[in-house]
């Protein structure tokens, strides 16, 4: 699953609030402004011997340049970041009844940083709703990823049914006490519905159903032990749905006040931009999470799939993913080349929508490095050197 469980991430996250710059300047957000972190410990003799014994998993891999092409610009952070973060973090802590320690860890995860890059021009109230949705999707997703719904198809389907009912107006009014996760989603839906057109509301519903449908497929595959019985394209098809990018794009449309007519939204070029965004998030996550997945014994990862299915080394698998990232860039520009003009007013919104697709992928990339989501305090060095050290085999959890 692409979206990590909240609790494990809370322990590993690091704050990024000291490195913010708003869109009041032209510099945006600069990762190079951070103080270089202490260098990672170099592989010792035992680790080098491990490479000789297990050449498929060396002590380190060289990651591809994930900051190239459409990811090379410096993202802009919404100037309402600090106010929205304070409001949203307090609210979710109260709703979920977090104790002080969990609330502090949640604050360090800094989902507002992520939302602020997705919609740098969003007003404060809309940015707060985007943060609330991000909190919801992590909590909701965790139930299917590592929680009680992971291997319970009937219960998973019921949870999805009840969540869809919220958007259909057929659900009871939830409270923080009766069902906090559904309550958060219901509050987000209420706020979007109050200011959005029927077309935008339907788009929100459709993209969430798309996400939910693939979560249920994931649960079925988990129960059936099908993690490595599909090819790369089948894996990517599933992950495009479960990654959460499609509803995140709809969320960012709301935040930015974008209004693309449905017949334009349905054009293959815009659909391909959404698909590229989802693929970039998936590929970045699977490379950067590989070390943590090894430590936790998790194998739902493209790296592991490539290594097992095609008998590749870790480095060869990374290189394949690097080629897939470059192919995403090519697909992006080909899609834009086929995009027709609809006139000034519509084209303005189309270009804003295209930028949202790009910003969702780029925001995930910068957030993943900056907050210690996967790499802990080594994110800056991995970005600078391209070297990601892997844990010794003796430290691994047997899945």
UniProtKB/Swiss-Prot annotation:
Assigned EC number: 4.2.3.74
DDXXD motif, short sequence motif: residues: 141-145
Catalytic activity: (2E,6E)-farnesyl diphosphate + H2O = presilphiperfolan-8beta-ol + diphosphate
Cofactor field: Mg(2+)
Binding site for Mg(2+) 3: 285, 289
Compositional bias annotation for Polar residues: 28-37
Induction: The botrydial biosynthesis cluster genes are co-regulated by the Ca(2+)/calcineurin signal transduction pathway, which is under the control of the alpha subunit BCG1 of a heterotrimeric G protein. Expression of the cluster is also positively regulated by the cluster-specific transcription factor BOT6.
Chain's role: Presilphiperfolan-8-beta-ol synthase; part of the gene cluster that mediates the biosynthesis of botrydial. Botrydial is necessary for colonization of plant tissue by the T4 strain. It is a strain-dependent virulence factor since highly aggressive strains like SAS56 or B05 still retain substantial virulence when botrydial synthesis is impaired, since they produce also botcinic acid. The first step of botrydial biosynthesis is performed by the sesquiterpene synthase BOT2 which catalyzes the cyclization of farnesyl diphosphate (FPP) to presilphiperfolan-8-beta-ol (PSP).
Cross-referenced PANTHER family: BETA-PINACENE SYNTHASE-RELATED, TERPENE SYNTHASE
Free-text comment about domains: The Asp-Asp-Xaa-Xaa-Asp/Glu (DDXXD/E) motif is important for the catalytic activity, presumably through binding to Mg(2+).
The protein's name: Presilphiperfolan-8-beta-ol synthase
Record organism: Botryotinia fuckeliana (Noble rot fungus)
Gene: BOT2
């Amino acid at each position: 699953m692409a979206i990590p469980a909240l609790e494990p991430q809370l322990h590993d996250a690091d704050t990024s609030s000291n490195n913010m710059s708003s869109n009041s300047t032209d510099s945006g957000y600069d990762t190079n402004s951070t103080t270089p972190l202490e260098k990672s410990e170099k592989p010792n003799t035992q680790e080098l011997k491990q490479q000789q014994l297990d050449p498929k998993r060396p002590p380190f891999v060289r990651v591809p340049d994930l900051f190239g092409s459409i990811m090379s610009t410096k993202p802009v952070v919404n100037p309402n970041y600090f106010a929205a973060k304070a409001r949203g973090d307090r609210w979710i802590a109260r709703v979920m009844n977090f104790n002080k320690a969990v609330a502090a860890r949640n604050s360090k995860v800094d989902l507002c940083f992520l939302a602020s890059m997705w919609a740098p021009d969003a007003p404060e109230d809309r940015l707060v709703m985007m943060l609330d949705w991000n909190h919801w999707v992590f909590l909701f997703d965790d139930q299917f990823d590592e929680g009680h719904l992971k291997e319970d198809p009937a219960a998973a389907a019921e949870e999805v049914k009840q969540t869809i009912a919220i958007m259909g107006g057929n659900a009871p009014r939830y409270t923080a006490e009766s069902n906090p996760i559904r309550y958060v989603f219901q509050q987000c839906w209420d706020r979007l519905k109050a200011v959005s057109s029927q077309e935008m509301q339907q788009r929100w519903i459709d993209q969430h159903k798309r996400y939910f449908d693939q979560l249920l497929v994931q649960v079925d595959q988990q129960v059936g032990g099908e993690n490595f019985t599909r090819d790369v394209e089948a894996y990517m098809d599933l992950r495009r749905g479960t990654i959460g990018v499609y509803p995140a794009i709809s969320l960012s449309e709301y935040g930015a006040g974008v209004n693309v007519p449905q017949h334009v939204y349905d054009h293959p070029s815009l659909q391909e931009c959404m698909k590229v965004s989802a693929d970039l998030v998936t590929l970045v996550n699977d490379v950067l999470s590989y070390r943590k997945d090894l430590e936790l014994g998790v194998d739902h990862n493209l790296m592991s799939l490539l290594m097992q299915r095609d008998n590749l080394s870790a480095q060869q698998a990374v290189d394949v993913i690097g080629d897939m990232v470059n192919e995403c860039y090519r697909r992006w520009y080909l899609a834009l080349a086929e995009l027709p003009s609809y006139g000034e007013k519509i084209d303005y919104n189309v270009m804003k929508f295209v930028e949202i697709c790009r910003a969702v992928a780029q925001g995930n990339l910068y957030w993943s490095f900056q907050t210690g989501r996967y790499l802990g305090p080594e994110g800056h060095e991995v970005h600078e050197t391209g070297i990601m050290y892997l844990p010794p085999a003796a430290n691994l959890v047997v899945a």
